[in-house]
């Protein structure tokens, strides 16, 4: 089975070679755990290191802010967008505001699953995308809880069907044991959970792979850091929670 390299140092070792191609992975965690950074790094490195065009569906943040946040890590996606290798789908602004008018891909009503999927299909075909990030599916559950799981299933079907590999981020509350959204964990191929826990008076970051269809993987909790160049995972270390 073909693997998709994450572009995150140490992560592919934990996944025994990378994410199986066409898998949709749920990346869940509380506030400040690094979900958006992980997702953005997966997409950016996909383009620059593996020549795999990428798309970020922005449901929680303005595209202008996303570009600025990524630039802080040295990830200049403006150039990649101009080259047709990276695309942001604006599903945040509802097409309102002067900045939104300059976006190439806009979902005017993110609650309309058909419009969201149509815009995503167009962008995938336009740039020949191989990687997709949706940040975050939690927004779907907040806006339309009854239809959200169906929308996640539809997105998975479209993304996998078009040969792409994806990360869906999902917000959970501090201390929550689930993965965010009722039943969403059953709609995806893999689950990676990011945590931020206080240990001996200090906040420590860690991640654990709960499931990953198509591959074996580490069952241990591994520490990771967020540096000025992105996330680094330590596959040879294990973090024990008290």
Curated annotation (Swiss-Prot):
Pfam families: ATPase. Keywords: ATP-binding, Nucleotide-binding. GO terms for molecular function: ATP binding. ATP binds at residues 29-36. Residues 2-242 form the KaiC domain. The keyword Methyltransferase does not apply. Belongs to the UPF0273 family. This is UPF0273 protein MJ1359. It comes from Methanocaldococcus jannaschii (strain ATCC 43067 / DSM 2661 / JAL-1 / JCM 10045 / NBRC 100440) (Methanococcus jannaschii).
